[in-house]
Amino acid sequence: LFRSVLFPAVRAQSLEECRQAAEQNYPIIRQYDLIARTTELTVRNIQKAWFPQISVTAQGSYQNKVTAWPENLQGLFAQMGLQLQGLSRDQYKVGIDVRQTLFDGGTIGSRREIARGEGAVQAAQTEVDLYKIGQRVHEMYFALLLLDEQLRLNADANALLRSNEQQLAAMLKSGTASAGDFENVKAERLSAEQQQTDLLSQRQTLQRLLSLFCGIPVDSIRRPPVPNLPSGENKRPELRLFDCRLQLTDAQEKALDAQLLPQLGLFAQGYYGNPGLNLFEDMMKRRWSWNGIAGLKLTWNLSALYTHRNEKSKLRVQRELIENARQQFLFNNRLDETQQSENVRRFRAIAQRDGEIIALRTAVRKAAESKLAHGIIDVNGLLREINKENAAKTQQAIHEIDMLKAMYDLKFSHNE
């Protein structure tokens, strides 16, 4: 209701307009932006691994043994009047540790590609979910189109019955028709009006559902043009999802290979504490001091070899599962396309006879009207012919809508 007040002039009357409106209205559309933002933030965080990594530490400990002067030296110091106690058993330090990566073997880059690959998979899955929304719009749109045709044909039949009812009323006054004939036609006309009311109610319900689904008022729809049948490459979003999942496994494999390479970096450590790096001085004075160390560090994690082969095998199995899922999808999709192609051919063949059948039914109905006027047949014979003519027109409308829907089903299966 709020959207209707804000956007009262928006109308979606074509199939494509309804589909696009439904996609924009469906809550999952917001996931595209959320996925992109999350992926970008993740990549930025990973990239910051190239920044200097700084940590602050504070430590206090107690040791049962510490570095001490040999006993002979302690005796010598005592003779000299020096009281040297050695290092204290309780030791403390507060420091800072800085590390800068120079070469990581491709670990950071592979993590970045994995993050982007995961984002691509999530976006592709969202596209698949949105594509299913199009199928629901597709079904409601053609159901609404069929109801419009049924309403039109029922209105034509109602007008025809009303015309015959008026003719019988005149004949009743002149004494050439019975009251039973007049009442029979009137009852048939009222039945047609009752059916019209039911069809209108169905249309209003379906129209309301489609409007809510699209997020905009759908007042009227128009029959879509006859499309060209698909003949090119299959563009279903599920295929892109499979490709993204395979690309993610490639990034994961590169990350495994990067774990086998050594890493090189600079490091610097500084702390204020007791004891310091000059143990001899601290053994003599036991005082807090500033200390620092810097250098170049090479790290090679050989334990990654333990699981490397198994992890590679897991990725191969994962690729096989993805390819198997792709083949299953393509197989089922080909079955759907084959069935839809056969439906198009079947409805096209059936529709070729509809025009001829309607022309014959119309001629028979007109002849029945003439016979009734001359008293050759009763009103029941006319009603039978009117119903047969209306049924033939209804079947033609159903065949045309079904054929058109089958064509768009085929395009939908191919995403064209």
Regions of interest found by a model, annotated:
Residues 17, 41, 129-240, 245-247, ...:
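Periplasmic alpha-helical coiled-coil/stalk elements that build and connect Gram-negative outer-membrane
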Residues 10-65, 176-178, 214-252, 261, ...:
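Bacterial Sec-pathway N-terminal export signals of envelope proteins
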Residues 188-216, 359-416:
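Short segments within alpha-helical structural elements
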Residues 30-34, 47, 102-130, 180, ...:
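Sec/SRP-type N-terminal targeting helices
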Residues 57-97, 267-304:
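Small/polar, glycine/serine/threonine/aspartate-rich low-complexity segments that form flexible
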